[in-house]
Amino acid sequence: MATHVLAAAAERNAALAPDAPLAPVTMERPVRTDLETSIPKPYMARGLVAPDMDHPNGTPGHVHDNLSVLQQHCAFFDQDDNGIIYPWETYSGLRQIGFNVIASLIMAIVINVALSYPTLPGWIPSPFFPIYLYNIHKAKHGSDSGTYDTEGRYLPMNFENLFSKHARTMPDRLTLGELWSMTEANREAFDIFGWIASKMEWTLLYILARDQDGFLSKEAIRRCYDGSLFEYCAKMQRGAEDKMK
């Protein structure tokens, strides 16, 4: 009887084990098993908010306007709130959050050229390279962290695992080297566009939001996902400009 009980217990433990002994990478990149202590149903994708263990209800004061989290990530750059982001709006948004003229110009061209066509409502390309927020989920690339799903929802579990897997120096922030290692770990076979896009996005975020010690904080990354980081950066830039006057 005792043998059967022990066997059943061992089977249950195996069914819930996050590690596989013959796959060392599963131990090198552990996943969190305590998420439900703070986040209800952390495995369930969120359509409107971007929660984590410290903010189970998302960003305080951030208005979602019934947009998906991926749409919110992009909405700051929709300068006239018409649901379409043109290159000059991308440029303006980048300038507002602190990038210089040359960097903003290059990034605006690259971003809109790369993302415009998948989001168009029809098959005919536009010479103005607009990005339609309504279809932004169609522009999601591979080799990413998996924090957005294919419909633009936010997955708290994948966000938290980003740090349990890759944050080696500090549990709630990443170094540039750790960011690079993360993008390498997320690479999917033959996904050249995804490899490049992922490295470019994380490098730009690091440049924008790193702290004085050279870390990219968990909170900055989370707020990037729901777009509230861009609003914050623009506010800080306006404050700095006002002090210069």
Swiss-Prot record:
Cofactor names from the entry are: heme b; Ca(2+)
Q: Where is this motif: Proline-knot?
A: 121-130
Where on the tree of life does the source sit, at the highest rank?
Eukaryota
The alphabetized list of GO BP terms reads: seed maturation
Q: State which tissues express it.
A: Expressed in seeds (at protein level). Not expressed in stem, leaf or root (at protein level).
Record's catalysed reaction(s): RH + ROOH = ROH + ROH
Decide whether keyword Metal-binding is in the record: yes
UniProt GO MF annotations = calcium ion binding; monooxygenase activity; plant seed peroxygenase activity
> How is this protein annotated for GO cellular component?
endoplasmic reticulum; membrane; monolayer-surrounded lipid storage body
Residues of the EF-hand domain? 65-100
N-acetylalanine carried by residues: 2
Tell me where the cross-link Glycyl lysine isopeptide (Lys-Gly) (interchain with G-Cter in ubiquitin) is found: 165, 235
Which enzyme type, at the first EC level? oxidoreductase
Per its UniProt record, what InterPro entries does this chain match? Caleosin-related (IPR007736)
Q: What is its main location?
A: other
The record's subcellular locations are: Lipid droplet; Microsome membrane
Function as written in the Swiss-Prot or TrEMBL entry: Calcium-binding peroxygenase involved in the degradation of storage lipid in oil bodies. May be involved in the interaction between oil bodies and vacuoles during seed germination.
| Protein family (similarity comment) | Belongs to the caleosin family.
Record text on subunit structure and interactions: Homodimer.
Give the protein's recorded name: Peroxygenase
Source organism of the structure: Sesamum indicum
